[in-house]
C-alpha cells in the first residue's frame, strides 16, 4: 500500500514537470514582493517610501574609531545607524594585489548564540593584501579621509564619515560610488521578542482613547504601508503552503553602488535577458529586480530577471574610458536593482544589492581595461580548470538511452554516418530505481563491458549522479549516510526528507568538508560497481531541487554544518556538490593524474575551477536558440567559460531547420552537447535525412577541426582569466556601437561568429568590428578579405557565418577522425590571416590532453609571428618543458592577404627551400608538406 501511495504521489509530482512544457509556472517562484526582506530593503515604486527609507538608513562613521593597522594592511572603523545608540557595525577596508579593493561589514558584538555566515572555499588561498598608505589622513577638521595602494599608483579610495559614503577613483577619476543613495541596510541579529503579558481590562474611557488612536493610524495610509514594509515577515514567512520559521529573525543586508560614467553593465548570470543588463527601476520602469537564487526551473521563459540554476554575483561596468566591477560575496538569496541615470555631465548606472543574510563583503575590481578585470576576478576565484581534450568534442545525450543495445546502436550510428563524437551519456533511467552509483541490471547487465566497448574506440561515457539520496535502508549510500549523520537536518533536527526522482529523499550536507571527503570515496571503483576509467559524471538537480519544497527547493530553515541555516548557504550547495564529485574522479585512480570531467547545472563563483556548466532545461524554440548566445556570454564574463546550451532544446521536438542551425551554433560554443527530454522524439544527427545529415555532419566536423584553437584558448584562460567566448567589446573596448551586441561573439581573439538564429533566414547583416584600426576579416569558407563594417551576406542552410581576424594565426587539424583521441598525432594546418600592416601572430598549446602533467611543465606553448614577410615559430613561455617532444608536425601553412613571393626558404636543415602554391584572386599562399616539428623553432622567409 505504501509503495502504491508513493507511486501516485510521484506520478503527480512528475506530471507537474513532464506534462506542462509550454512555459514555467511562475506562481511557484518568488519575486521581490513575495520576499519580505527584499520589500524591506527595496526602494519601491509600489510602496513609495524612497524618501522615508533614505532618511532612516544613514550610517555614520563613529568619531575616533578609524585606525590603520599596518601589520594587517587593514583600515578599521565603526559604523552606527543615525539616531541609534546600539548595534555598532565594524568595517574593514583592504587593497589586494592587482588593485582590488575589499570592504567588509558586520556586527561589532553579535549575539553569542548567533552568527552570520561568511562565504568559505570560494576565494583562493593565494590572495594577498598590499600595504596601504594614507592619501588624506582622518582628522577632526575633515569629514573625509582617503587611502591608496602603498606600492603603485592604480586607484585610491575616498571615504566620507557623515553620512558614510565610499568612492573608488581610478586614474584620479571617480569610477564607483558606494552608498550615495543611503541604501546601506544592515538588520542586526536579535532574539525573538517574547509575547507581552495579557493586558488588564481597560476602563471605558481608555477603550475610547485606544479606538480613537487606531482610527487615526488607519487614516494615515503612508504610515500603514511603511509599517507593513518595516515589520512584516520578521519571524516567520509563508509562501504558498510552505512556512519558513525564521528562527534567527531578520538578518538582511543591502548596499547601493553607482558606476559613474557608464551606460552598460553586464554579468550576474544566470538570467535570460540580453547581455547588457536592463534597468529594473526608475524612469517609469516597473520590473522585478534580478534575482540570484539557484532554482530548478523546469522550463524557463525568455527576457526574465527571475532566478535560474546558478548565479555569480559579479557585475562588470564598461564604457569607452574604463572597465570596472563589483563582486558581492554572499551565498544567500540576493536581488539586484538596476537604474539608468542621466546627468548633464555623463550617464551612470545605479545598482542596489539586497541579500537575505550574511555579511557585507564586497570586492571592487578597478580594471581599468577588460583584460585587467578578468585577471583581477581570476586572482580572487581562479581560472577555468583545463579540460581534457575529449570534453571539447561533441557529446550525445538523451533522457534516456534505454539499454546497452541502445547505446551500441547510437554509437555505431555515428560511425555509419561518418560523424565524429566523443561521449555518450546516460540519464537517470540507467540506475536501479534512481539509486545513484547503481545500474538497472535488466537493461544494463554488463556496464563495464559496455564502457570498454565504447572505450575501444577511444570514446567516453557519462552517467548522471544527483544529490538526492533515496531513503531506502537497503541502499548502501543511504544507510551509511544515515548512520554517520551526514544529512542536512530539518528545523526540528531530524534528517531532511524531500521528494525528488527516487521519491522520498534526503540530502547530504556538502558544506561539511568531512562529508565532501566521504562523498568523493563513493566514486572509487570498489564502491561504484561497474564503473571504469572511461566513465565520467553529470551532476544535475543540485540547486538543490526538492519537488515538494518551497519553490521546488529546500526549506530555508533547514540546518547545515556549523549551525547555519540553508538560507545562508543556498547558492553554495551545488558548488560544493560539484567540487566533491570532481574530487572523487581524481581520487579514484591510484596516480590521481586524470583530469576530472563533471558537468553541473548549479554553479557559483569559483565553479570554473571545477568543471563544465550548462544552461539547463531550454526548449526547442528559435527564441531559446537565440538567447543561448547572450546567456553564455554573460557566464563567460563571470568566469564560467566552459559552458554550453543543450543543442536542439531539451523540451519539445525541433524541426530539421532548427536542429541544424542549433548544431551550427553549438559547434562554436565552449561546451557542445545534444540533449533531449524523455518525451521528445529521437533526434540523433542522422535521423532527419538529407540535406540535414550532411550539413549537421559538416558543422560537427568543423568543430573538431578547430579543437587546437579551443584548447589553446582554454589554456590561455588559465594564464589570464580571459573569457573563451567573449563579447566584441572585450576586444574593441572603445567602439561604443558594440556595447549592446550579443548575437555576434569572438572565440578567443581570433574568430568572430554570428550564428543564424532566425527561422527561414536567407540573408543577414554582420557587424565586423575594428573600423577605427582598419581591421580586416576573412570569411573562413570563401577566404575572401572584408574590411571592418556592416556587411550583408547570404545565409543558405549550410552557411555558418564565421570570420578570422586579420592579424591572427590559428592552428587547425583538418583530418576527419572518429574522436579526439585519434587526432592526437595528426599534423597541424596553420592559417595566417594578415592585417592591414601585413602582420599576424598567434599561439598554439599542446600537452597530453588528459593528465595533470602540464602542471609539471610537460607542455608546449608556441608562438607564431609573421612580420616583414618572415614567419617565426618559437617558445611562447619559459615554462614549457624542453623534454616534452610530441611527434607532431605542421603539414600545411596557409597565408591570406600576402603578395606572391619569388621563393620561400627555411632555416631548418633539409627544409631550406619550400614549395608553394599561390592564388592571385584571393592573395592566398599555401605551403604544403613543410613537415616541421611543433617542438622545433624555425624561421620561414618569403623572398
Curated annotation (Swiss-Prot):
Region annotation Disordered: where it falls in the sequence: 186-231
Q: Which InterPro entries match?
A: Gal_mutarotase_sf_dom (IPR011013), Glyco_hydro_31_AS (IPR030458), Glyco_hydro_31_C (IPR048395), Glyco_hydro_31_N_dom (IPR025887), Glyco_hydro_31_TIM (IPR000322), Glyco_hydro_b (IPR013780), Glycoside_hydrolase_SF (IPR017853)
A GO biological process of this protein is: carbohydrate metabolic process
- Entry-listed glycosylation sites: 878, 887, 907
Q: Which SUPFAM superfamilies match?
A: (Trans)glycosidases (SSF51445), Galactose mutarotase-like (SSF74650), Glycosyl hydrolase domain (SSF51011)
Signal peptide: which range, if any?
1-23
Q: Where is the composition biased (Basic and acidic residues)?
A: 198-211
Indicate whether Transcription appears among the record's keywords: no
Main EC class of this protein?
Answer: hydrolase
Active site residues of this protein: 540, 543, 617
Q: Where in the cell is it found?
A: Endoplasmic reticulum; Golgi apparatus
Q: Which reaction does it catalyse?
A: N(4)-(alpha-D-Glc-(1->3)-alpha-D-Man-(1->2)-alpha-D-Man-(1->2)-alpha-D-Man-(1->3)-[alpha-D-Man-(1->2)-alpha-D-Man-(1->3)-[alpha-D-Man-(1->2)-alpha-D-Man-(1->6)]-alpha-D-Man-(1->6)]-beta-D-Man-(1->4)-beta-D-GlcNAc-(1->4)-beta-D-GlcNAc)-L-asparaginyl-[protein] + H2O = N(4)-(alpha-D-Man-(1->2)-alpha-D-Man-(1->2)-alpha-D-Man-(1->3)-[alpha-D-Man-(1->2)-alpha-D-Man-(1->3)-[alpha-D-Man-(1->2)-alpha-D-Man-(1->6)]-alpha-D-Man-(1->6)]-beta-D-Man-(1->4)-beta-D-GlcNAc-(1->4)-beta-D-GlcNAc)-L-asparaginyl-[protein] (N-glucan mannose isomer 9A1,2,3B1,2,3) + beta-D-glucose; N(4)-(alpha-D-Glc-(1->3)-alpha-D-Glc-(1->3)-alpha-D-Man-(1->2)-alpha-D-Man-(1->2)-alpha-D-Man-(1->3)-[alpha-D-Man-(1->2)-alpha-D-Man-(1->3)-[alpha-D-Man-(1->2)-alpha-D-Man-(1->6)]-alpha-D-Man-(1->6)]-beta-D-Man-(1->4)-beta-D-GlcNAc-(1->4)-beta-D-GlcNAc)-L-asparaginyl-[protein] + H2O = N(4)-(alpha-D-Glc-(1->3)-alpha-D-Man-(1->2)-alpha-D-Man-(1->2)-alpha-D-Man-(1->3)-[alpha-D-Man-(1->2)-alpha-D-Man-(1->3)-[alpha-D-Man-(1->2)-alpha-D-Man-(1->6)]-alpha-D-Man-(1->6)]-beta-D-Man-(1->4)-beta-D-GlcNAc-(1->4)-beta-D-GlcNAc)-L-asparaginyl-[protein] + beta-D-glucose
Principal location: endoplasmic reticulum
Keywords assigned by UniProt? Endoplasmic reticulum, Glycoprotein, Glycosidase, Golgi apparatus, Hydrolase, Signal
GO terms of molecular function: alpha-glucosidase activity; carbohydrate binding; Glc2Man9GlcNAc2 oligosaccharide glucosidase activity; glucan 1,3-alpha-glucosidase activity
Give the pathway annotation: Glycan metabolism; N-glycan metabolism
Q: Name one GO cellular component term.
A: endoplasmic reticulum
Q: Does the keyword Secreted apply?
A: no
Q: Name one Pfam family in it.
A: Gal_mutarotas_2
Q: Could you say which EC number(s) this protein's record lists?
A: 3.2.1.207
According to its UniProt entry, the function of this protein is described as:
Cleaves sequentially the 2 innermost alpha-1,3-linked glucose residues from N-linked oligosaccharides on newly synthesized glycoproteins.
Family stated for the protein in its record = Belongs to the glycosyl hydrolase 31 family.
Q: What is this protein called?
A: Neutral alpha-glucosidase AB
State the organism named in the record: Dictyostelium discoideum (Social amoeba)
Amino acid at each position: 500500500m505504501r509503495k502504491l501511495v508513493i507511486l501516485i504521489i510521484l506520478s503527480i509530482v512528475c506530471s507537474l514537470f513532464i506534462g506542462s512544457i509550454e512555459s514555467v509556472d511562475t506562481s511557484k517562484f518568488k519575486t521581490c514582493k513575495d520576499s519580505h526582506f527584499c520589500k524591506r530593503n527595496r526602494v519601491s515604486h509600489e510602496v513609495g517610501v524612497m524618501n522615508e527609507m533614505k532618511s532612516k538608513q544613514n550610517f555614520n562613521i563613529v568619531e575616533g574609531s578609524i585606525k590603520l593597522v599596518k601589520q594587517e594592511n587593514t583600515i578599521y572603523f565603526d559604523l552606527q545607524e543615525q539616531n541609534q545608540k546600539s548595534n555598532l557595525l565594524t568595517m574593514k577596508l583592504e587593497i589586494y594585489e592587482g588593485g582590488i579593493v575589499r570592504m567588509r561589514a558586520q556586527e561589532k558584538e553579535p549575539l553569542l548564540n548567533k552568527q552570520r555566515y561568511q562565504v568559505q572555499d570560494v576565494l583562493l588561498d593565494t590572495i594577498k593584501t598590499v600595504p596601504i598608505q594614507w592619501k588624506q589622513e582622518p582628522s577632526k577638521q575633515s569629514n573625509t579621509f582617503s587611502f591608496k595602494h602603498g606600492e603603485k599608483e592604480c586607484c585610491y579610495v575616498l571615504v566620507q564619515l557623515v553620512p558614510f559614503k565610499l568612492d573608488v577613483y581610478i586614474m584620479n577619476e571617480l569610477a564607483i560610488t558606494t552608498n550615495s543613495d543611503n541604501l546601506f541596510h544592515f538588520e542586526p541579529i536579535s532574539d525573538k521578542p517574547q509575547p507581552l503579558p495579557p493586558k488588564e481590562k481597560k476602563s471605558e474611557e481608555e477603550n475610547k482613547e485606544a479606538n480613537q488612536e487606531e482610527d487615526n493610524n488607519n487614516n494615515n495610509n503612508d504610515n500603514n504601508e511603511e509599517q507593513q514594509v518595516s515589520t512584516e515577515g520578521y519571524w516567520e514567512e509563508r509562501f504558498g503552503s510552505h512556512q519558513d520559521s525564521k528562527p534567527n529573525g531578520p538578518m538582511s543586508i543591502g548596499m547601493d553602488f553607482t558606476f559613474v560614467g557608464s551606460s552598460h553593465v553586464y554579468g550576474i548570470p544566470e538570467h535570460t535577458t540580453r547581455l547588457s543588463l536592463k534597468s529594473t527601476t526608475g524612469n517609469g520602469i516597473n520590473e522585478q529586480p534580478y534575482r540570484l537564487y539557484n532554482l530548478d526551473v523546469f522550463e524557463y521563459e525568455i527576457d526574465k530577471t527571475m532566478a535560474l540554476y546558478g548565479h555569480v554575483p559579479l557585475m562588470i561596468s564598461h564604457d569607452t574610458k574604463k572597465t570596472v566591477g563589483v563582486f558581492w560575496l554572499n551565498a544567500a538569496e540576493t536581488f539586484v536593482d538596476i537604474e539608468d541615470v542621466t546627468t548633464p555631465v555623463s550617464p551612470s548606472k545605479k545598482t542596489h544589492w539586497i541579500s537575505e543574510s550574511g555579511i557585507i563583503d564586497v570586492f571592487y575590481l578597478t580594471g581599468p581595461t577588460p583584460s585587467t578585470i578578468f585577471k583581477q576576478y581570476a586572482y580572487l576565484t581562479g581560472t577555468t580548470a583545463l579540460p581534457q581534450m575529449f570534453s571539447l568534442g561533441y557529446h550525445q545525450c538523451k533522457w534516456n538511452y534505454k539499454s546497452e543495445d541502445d547505446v551500441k546502436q547510437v554509437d555505431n550510428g555515428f560511425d555509419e554516418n561518418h560523424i565524429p563524437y566523443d561521449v555518450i551519456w546516460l540519464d537517470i533511467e540507467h540506475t536501479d530505481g534512481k539509486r545513484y552509483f547503481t545500474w538497472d541490471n535488466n537493461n544494463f547487465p554488463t556496464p563495464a563491458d559496455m564502457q570498454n566497448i565504447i572505450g575501444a574506440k577511444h570514446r567516453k561515457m557519462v552517467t548522471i549522479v544527483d544529490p538526492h539520496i533515496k531513503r531506502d535502508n537497503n541502499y548502501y549510500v543511504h544507510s551509511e549516510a544515515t548512520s554517520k549523520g551526514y544529512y542536512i537536518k530539518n528545523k526540528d533536527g531530524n534528517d531532511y526528507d524531500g521528494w525528488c526522482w527516487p521519491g522520498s529523499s534526503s540530502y547530504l550536507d556538502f558544506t561539511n568538508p568531512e562529508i565532501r571527503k566521504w562523498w568523493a570515496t563513493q566514486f572509487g571503483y570498489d564502491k561504484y560497481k561497474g564503473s571504469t576509467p572511461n566513465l565520467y559524471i553529470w551532476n544535475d538537480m543540485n540547486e538543490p531541487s526538492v519537488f515538494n519544497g518551497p519553490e521546488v527547493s529546500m526549506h530555508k530553515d533547514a540546518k547545515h554544518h556549523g549551525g547555519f541555516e540553508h538560507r545562508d548557504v543556498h547558492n553554495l550547495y551545488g558548488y560544493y556538490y560539484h567540487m566533491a564529485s570532481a574530487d572523487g574522479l581524481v581520487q579514484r585512480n591510484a596516480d590521481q593524474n586524470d583530469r576530472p570531467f563533471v558537468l553541473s547545472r548549479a554553479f557559483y563563483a569559483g565553479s570554473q575551477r571545477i568543471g563544465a556548466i550548462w544552461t539547463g532545461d531550454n526548449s526547442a524554440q528559435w527564441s531559446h536558440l537565440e538567447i543561448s548566445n547572450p546567456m553564455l556570454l554573460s557566464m563567460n564574463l563571470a568566469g564560467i567559460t566552459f559552458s554550453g546550451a543543450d543543442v536542439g532544446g531539451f523540451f519539445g521536438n525541433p524541426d530539421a531547420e532548427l536542429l541544424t542551425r542549433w548544431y551550427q551554433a553549438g559547434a562554436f560554443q565552449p561546451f557542445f552537447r545534444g540533449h533531449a527530454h524523455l518525451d521528445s522524439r529521437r533526434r540523433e544527427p542522422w535521423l532527419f535525412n538529407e540535406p540535414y545529415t550532411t550539413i549537421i555532419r559538416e558543422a560537427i566536423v568543423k568543430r573538431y577541426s578547430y579543437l587546437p584553437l579551443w584548447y589553446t584558448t582554454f589554456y590561455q584562460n588559465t594564464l589570464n582569466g580571459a573569457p573563451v567566448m567573449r563579447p566584441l567589446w572585450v576586444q574593441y573596448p572603445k567602439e561604443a556601437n558594440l556595447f549592446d551586441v550579443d548575437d555576434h561573439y569572438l572565440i578567443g581573439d581570433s574568430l568572430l561568429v554570428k550564428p543564424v538564429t532566425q527561422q527561414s533566414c536567407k540573408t543577414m547583416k554582420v557587424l565586423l568590428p575594428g573600423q577605427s584600426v582598419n581591421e580586416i576579416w576573412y570569411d573562413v569558407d570563401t577566404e575572401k578579405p572584408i574590411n571592418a563594417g556592416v556587411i550583408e551576406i547570404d545565409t543558405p542552410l549550410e552557411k555558418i557565418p564565421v570570420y578570422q581576424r586579420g592579424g591572427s594565426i590559428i592552428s587547425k587539424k583538418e583530418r576527419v577522425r572518429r574522436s579526439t583521441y585519434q587526432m592526437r598525432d595528426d599534423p597541424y594546418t596553420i592559417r595566417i590571416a594578415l592585417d592591414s600592416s601585413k602582420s599576424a601572430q598567434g599561439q598554439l598549446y599542446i600537452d597530453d590532453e588528459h593528465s595533470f602533467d602540464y602542471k609539471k611543465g610537460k607542455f608546449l606553448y608556441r608562438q607564431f609571428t609573421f612580420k616583414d614577410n618572415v614567419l617565426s615559430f618559437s617558445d611562447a613561455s619559459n615554462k614549457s618543458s624542453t623534454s616534452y617532444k610530441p611527434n607532431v608536425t605542421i603539414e600545411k601553412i596557409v597565408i591570406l592577404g600576402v603578395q606572391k613571393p619569388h621563393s620561400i626558404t627555411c632555416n631548418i636543415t633539409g627544409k631550406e627551400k619550400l614549395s608553394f602554391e599561390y592564388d592571385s584572386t584571393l592573395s592566398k599562399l599555401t605551403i604544403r608538406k613543410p613537415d616541421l616539428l611543433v617542438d622545433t623553432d624555425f624561421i620561414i622567409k618569403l623572398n
